């Protein structure tokens, strides 16, 4: 079934220029809708973890997310007195109180999660935004004004502090999703984008910006890497000298490995998760 679905989506993607809400084969519409529904329920995800820092990205699922925009017209959506005009409904709009309780998720107004995202049991959405295709795992808090971009993958027991931004894949078009692994703490107003992977148990200080072109400098080893924060790292914003010291350029600095002191200042509060 999955292979047939993948083949159908791949073929539709190759012929996407010919698709529209009024001109698309029913089998393509049904296939795309099936993928979105499975993403919404957490049975499919854009990327799956094989090990620490090792992920397999399912490009065909990302293609289905993009095709869903091609196949739908905007429509009027209401939330109380507020009106919206969009192609993607919100995730929780039509759930009853019992259905919401069964999800095990706490959603603080005016948090928004789009249909096609998955929010696991024990997660908390403060007034924040979770885009289509994103996956937020158990026990994670998405704090106020944080944004989980399209198809971003967030692990278990992660804290995304206020104003954090995780980049999406839809625009500008990115090959791989941004990934935050289990037990990470992302400090306020930090941005992780362009498919960067933050490996498990890492702490990103507030105001750190990491993209694929950002040098990640380990002050202990002197090594510079790109696109990946090693497991258990504590990262702050900084600069590296360039051109013989004539000027410096921004870098993310690994200052140490996570220790007991770090854990004591970034631990999750179980009282908030009752």
Swiss-Prot record:
One of its GO terms (molecular function) is nucleotidyltransferase activity. It comes from the Bacteria. It catalyses: (S)-2,3,4,5-tetrahydrodipicolinate + succinyl-CoA + H2O = (S)-2-succinylamino-6-oxoheptanedioate + CoA. Substrate binds at residues 106, 143. It is an enzyme of class 2 (transferase). Coiled coil: none annotated. The keyword Cytoplasm applies. The keyword Cytoplasm applies. Pathway: Amino-acid biosynthesis; L-lysine biosynthesis via DAP pathway; LL-2,6-diaminopimelate from (S)-tetrahydrodipicolinate (succinylase route): step 1/3. One of its GO terms (biological process) is diaminopimelate biosynthetic process. One of its GO terms (cellular component) is cytoplasm. It is found in: Cytoplasm. Homotrimer. NCBIfam families: dapD, PRK11830.1. Belongs to the transferase hexapeptide repeat family. This is 2,3,4,5-tetrahydropyridine-2,6-dicarboxylate N-succinyltransferase. It comes from Acidovorax sp. (strain JS42).
């Amino acid at each position: 079934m999955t292979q047939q679905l993948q083949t159908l989506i791949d073929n539709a993607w190759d012929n996407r220029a010919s698709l529209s809400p009024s001109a698309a084969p029913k089998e393509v519409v049904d296939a795309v809708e099936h993928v979105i529904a499975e993403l919404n329920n957490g049975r499919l995800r854009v990327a799956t973890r094989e090990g620490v820092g090792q992920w397999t990205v399912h490009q065909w699922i990302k293609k289905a997310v993009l095709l869903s925009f091609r196949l739908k017209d905007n429509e009027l959506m209401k939330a109380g007195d507020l009106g919206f005009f969009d192609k993607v409904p919100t995730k929780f709009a039509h759930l009853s109180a019992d259905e919401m309780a069964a999800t095990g998720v706490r959603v603080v107004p005016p948090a928004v999660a789009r249909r096609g995202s998955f929010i696991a049991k024990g997660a908390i959405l403060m007034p924040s935004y979770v885009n289509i295709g994103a996956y937020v795992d158990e026990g994670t808090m998405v704090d106020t004004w944080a944004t989980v971009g399209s198809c971003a993958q967030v692990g278990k027991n992660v804290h995304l502090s206020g104003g954090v931004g995780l980049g999406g894949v839809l625009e500008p078009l990115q090959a791989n999703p941004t990934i935050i692994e289990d037990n990470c703490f992302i400090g306020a107003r930090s941005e992780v984008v362009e498919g960067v992977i933050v490996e498990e148990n890492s702490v990103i200080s507030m105001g750190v910006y990491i993209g694929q072109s950002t040098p990640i400098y380990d002050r202990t080893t002197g090594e510079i890497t790109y696109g990946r924060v090693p497991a258990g790292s504590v990262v702050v914003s900084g600069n590296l000298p360039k051109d013989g010291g004539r000027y410096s350029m921004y870098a993310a600095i690994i200052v140490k490995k996570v220790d007991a002191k770090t854990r004591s200042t970034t631990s999750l509060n179980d009282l908030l998760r009752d």
